[in-house]
Swiss-Prot record:
Gene label: ycaR
Any one cellular-component term (Gene Ontology): cytosol
Origin superkingdom: Bacteria
PANTHER family, A to Z: PROTEIN PREY, MITOCHONDRIAL, ZGC:162634
The name this protein goes by in its record: UPF0434 protein YcaR
Protein family per UniProt: Belongs to the UPF0434 family.
Residues annotated as signal peptide: none
Organism: Escherichia coli O139:H28 (strain E24377A / ETEC)
């Protein structure tokens, strides 16, 4: 994931900052507790494709 891209893109729900989770290949919105998948290195920034973070994931 290109870190320059992270400076440009935002959460499609709240327009907040996204954080990259390399291990899970997801972009995380801490404000909405959502994780957006990366497929073949391409962010899928659709609310319908996002998963809700677990309580443990939200804390970290």
């Amino acid at each position: 994931m290109d870190h320059r891209l992270l400076e440009i893109i935002a959460c499609p729900v709240c327009n907040g900052k996204l954080w990259y989770n390399q291990e899970k290949q997801e972009l995380i919105c801490k404000l909405d507790n959502l994780a957006f998948p990366l497929r073949d290195g391409i962010p899928v920034l659709l609310e319908t494709e996002a998963r809700v973070l677990t309580a443990d994931e939200s804390k970290s």
